[in-house]
Structure formats: structure tokens, C-alpha cells
């Protein structure tokens, strides 16, 4: 089922029930843009001048780990250092945009496809490591904002037990408000899914004891790239 088409049909039925046409008009878009431009933002906590340092500090508070390299070509070596240090497999799925990096030179096998489930595999996952980029990283909270799309499939960040995110330093914004403003400026409309990732998955449902990896990755590792 094509999910974008299904979403459009649902929205069209809602608009019909409201007595409006099936498609959003330019006037409606302009009204929303005008509201967002005029709507005052609440008070914002200060963010230090070095957004990368602020992001690292907050990400580590959320139990993410962070590495930093100078260029994209150094990412495969950084990934291998990380997976070898934890005795993880040298095999991962990744977003299409990362497929051209020199993975094989570092002895890493990377397939650009969504992760597969394997009922016989560890924790019901056939693919244990997922490598993604991100739309922006948020310094205030140490979070990653991912936008879903054909080549930026959210499953790579949600299904494998280890999520590795490649983040250019130039894509670090101050706060969530700036992240959404940048989304509107660059994309104009929301994607099918927007994921805000703040460290590994966790839950405290049972006896208020925090357990990592209950509903998603056990680990989130961020590789900052100075010249992304």
C-alpha cells in the first residue's frame, strides 16, 4: 500500500466533511505561513556559541555516544572502531546517500536498503546495525531529527539494535523551533513521518526501572563530521 496516497485520501475525506475541497489551496497555505510567522515563540534557553559542543554534552546526557571526524571519508573507519569496540558485526544497512563511502576499504559490509526482520535472528532482527544521516541535530536537547522518504527510511534508525547517525556539524541547529523552521524552508511540507531521536529507546514500565532497547535501539552512536 502506498502510504502517501492513503494519507492523502484520509485528509481528503476530512476536508470533505468540513465542506472544503479535496486539495489544500494556496490561500490556506499562505494563512498557515502567516500564522507561523506572527505566532510568538516562548522563552528559549540560551545555547552556547559552540553548537557542536552543546549538542555533544546533551547527547551524552541522553546516553548517546559521540565521535567526531574531519571528513565524510573518515566515517567508515569511525564506524569500524565503534562496532569492533563493542564486538558487533561488521555488517550494516544504511541510507542510500551513505552507500558511496569507502566501506569495503575498512572491511565493513554495508547494504543500502531497509532492515529485514528474521524470526530466527537475535531479538527478531536480521539486521543488527543501521546507519543513517539526519535532517538536523538539535543542540538544546542532543536530539536527531530524521525525515522519512524513499532513501531516508526511518526503519534503519528504529529496527536494528544499534543506530549509528552521521551528522555534519553544519546541520546542528539551536532548538526544536529552529529545526521545524528549517524543515519548512527546505521542504515546504511535512514528510510522512518525522522522528525525533533522543538517545536509545527506553522504558520504565516495570517497577519504574529504566530498561534500554525495549522499543527500539539499545545504542545510539553519533558521528559528527566537521566538513560534511
Q: Where is each model-derived feature located?
A:
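The feature marks the mature, well-folded catalytic cores of soluble enzymes
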Residues: 1-228
